[in-house]
Amino acid sequence: MKTLLRGGYVVSGRGCRRADVLIDGEKVEMLGHIPPELAAQSEVVDVTGCMLFPGFIDAHTHFDLDVCSTTTADDFESGSKGAIRGGTTTVIDFACPNKGESLAYGLDLWHKKADGKCYCDYGFHMTIDDWNESIESELDAMFDAGITSFKMYLTYPAMMIGDGAVYRALKALKVRGGIAGVHCENAGVIDERIAELKASGLGADVVSHPISRPDYLEAEAVSRLLRIAQAADAPVIIVHTTNRASLDEIAAARRRGQTVYVETCPQYLALDDGVYYDPDFSSAARYVCAPPIRSQEDSEALWKALRRGEVQTISTDHCSFTLEQKDMGRDDFTKIPGGLPGVETRGEVVYTVAINENKLSLGGVCRALSENPAKLYGLYPRKGVIAAGSDADIVVYDPGASHVLHGADMLSKAGYTPFEGFRTNGGVSKVYLRGQLQVDGGKVVGGKMGEYLKRGKCAL
């Protein structure tokens, strides 16, 4: 039987309009006025007054990742379950082979981690932490497997590659129509600052984390990457962008005619660096991530850039650890596992701040959470839009379902949320994944029906 969502407002990147939505199997059949004869053959679901968003897409998650001598709290089962509960119907995680391992090995390993365990659809980026003829020879096979986006690091010794390797990789990806997202921080200077902080007796202070990784060292790496991309004549994505200085470097590159896409995250939009100054170690350590959370002024700059279309996507960089795992760094801040849970709360936090504080329109929220990620990562128009022929991935967002976020209520195994005590403006009521009801009344009612997505090329 078909499903008819009646009485809602369909949200797109252009705004919202009153429209009913008819679902047939996994696809949207039509929207607008549904003929009575079709309505009579359908299960009618009353969504009066609710916003109907295209399923949210989180293009930056780290599930079941070994890091800092431990493993993230969330695997693909718990991570994807939290994702679907929060309205995210697609995640794109990172396959991460170690240096010396093949890309094919990394892809196979991540399929073993994810296949058959996901409550939402999923895809992979491929991490490039080494560059040689062997790695380059594997690129065509990655594209055949539906991997068209890649990740590189300008920091972390175990994962970073040199500037020359970045240049060669960008050129190789451009030829194939691929694109790279890059983590931009200046590794060498950060290491020196860490050594200085420890020598001055501040090695156990959580606040040493943001002090060691200031905004200008992120901006320097952004600038360097963009000059490398200019030399390679290749597009790039700056992931988890946090500050005004980096945005200035990106604006300069665009004035030169470069193609640059920008991602930010809810923690950089709704929190500020005051979280690191809590005298209680556990309270401060839970916010340790890289790059660090920045100032209120940086948050305002990011919102302004979102309004102007200068930042295209909001992902989470979900990389969760329990507070017990965070305690590994009680005597040495560099041993605190870096990362936050966020995949379950992204939609509600972004919607609330955007609408309550007039930061972003409904259309802007849809572009950042759904439409632009789908276009950027080769999923549009199958995903990212409610239109005839698209997957029936639909978030029913009820403006009357406000609630307070508490870590104890989260599905994440981290056991906490960085947005503890945050009151939402409305909430996710129902979620459909390819036409099947996965969330009802804010509770996951469906199973592990997530499918692997072979993605096309960037169309943003």
Regions inferred by a protein language model and the residue ranges of each:
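His/Asp/Glu-enriched, well-ordered alpha-helical/loop segment
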Residues: 203-235, 286-287, 308, 312-314, ...
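Metal-associated gating/positioning segment near the N- to mid-region
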Residues: 48-117, 134
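C-terminal cap of metal-dependent C-N hydrolases
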Residues: 8, 328-332, 388-454
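Alpha-helix-loop-beta-strand connector modules within alpha/beta enzyme cores
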Residues: 104-120, 168-182
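Histidine-rich, glycine-flanked metal-binding segment
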Residues: 1-55
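Divalent metal-coordination and catalytic microenvironments
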Residues: 8, 26, 49, 60, ...
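Histidine/acidic residue-rich metal-binding segments in metalloenzymes
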Residues: 134-314
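Short acidic/polar active-site loop segments enriched in Thr and Asp
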Residues: 88-90, 120, 148, 312
